[in-house]
A protein has these predicted regions:
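Alpha-helical scaffold elements adjacent to nucleotide-binding pockets in ATP/GTP-utilizing enzyme cores
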Residues: 109-113, 166-169, 193
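Conserved ATPase-coupling elements of RecA-like P-loop NTPase cores
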Residues: 106-107, 159-164
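Conserved small/polar residues in nucleotide/adenosyl-binding loops
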Residues: 1-4, 191-198
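Conserved nucleotide-binding/hydrolysis micro-motifs of P-loop NTPases
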Residues: 101-104, 127-128, 155-158, 185-189
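Inter-motif core of Ras-like GTPase G domains
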Residues: 165-184
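Primarily NTPase-proximal linker/entry elements flanking Walker-type ATP/GTP-binding cores
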Residues: 3-99, 106-127, 134-153
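Structural motif
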Residues: 131-135, 189-190
Length: 198
């Protein structure tokens, strides 16, 4: 953990807790010590990351999910996976919305994903107004009977005030049922790593 730049205090607390639990366990004859150790580490990692799974609150008609996150964190890919899962397991009729107006291939990527999973994609080629695109998509979803709208937005950094204002404006305009923040641990590592030294 330390080599992967996890905060020292977090890593120390985690390893101390794992050690304490491992030393305090009586190993059942049916369980190997290595299996017990894997379970303890898994349980502690789960607790460290929040511990509980929460269901999505998708009560609106259509229900709206706003995707947000850092640049390159996988929002577009996750949007497609989420649409496929909710379509298959929750019998939803999703519409994907391409609101990343900055990355040239973003609309194409979402369109290809939509075709692969047989989920339509709403886009407005040439438009540079993601707020209006999202509002128009919701209007179309209502008109065509889609019960789920997944809005894929551009990646951003907290230090980019214009982009932060944009995601705030989108959220205010569409009032989503859920806002999901997509994070990739390697991307976060890149953003938090110190700059290279000569």
């Amino acid at each position: 953990m330390y080599k992967r730049q996890v905060n020292y205090k977090v890593a120390k607390s985690f390893t101390d807790t794992v050690k304490e639990k491992a030393l305090g366990q009586n190993v059942l004859t049916a369980v190997k010590p290595s299996q017990l150790m894997v379970k303890i580490v898994h349980d502690e990692l789960t607790a460290l990351m929040g511990g509980e799974t929460a269901e999505l609150e998708l009560n609106g008609r259509p229900a709206i999910i706003l995707m947000s996150g850092l640049q390159g964190s996988g929002k577009t890919t996750f949007s497609g996976k989420l649409a496929r899962m909710l379509k298959a397991k929750k019998n939803r009729k999703p519409l994907l919305v391409a609101c990343d107006v900055y990355r040239p291939a973003a609309v194409d990527q979402l369109t290809v994903l939509g075709e692969q999973i047989e989920v339509p994609v709403y886009s407005e080629p040439g438009s540079k107004d993601p707020v209006q695109i999202a509002l128009n998509a919701i209007h179309e979803a209502k008109a065509k009977g889609y019960d789920l709208v997944i809005v894929d937005t551009a990646g951003r950094l907290a230090i980019d005030e214009q982009m932060m204002n944009e995601i705030e404006a989108i959220k205010k305009a569409i009032n989503p049922d859920e806002t999901l923040f997509v994070v990739d641990s390697m991307t976060c590592l890149l953003y938090t790593s110190p700059s290279p030294r000569d």
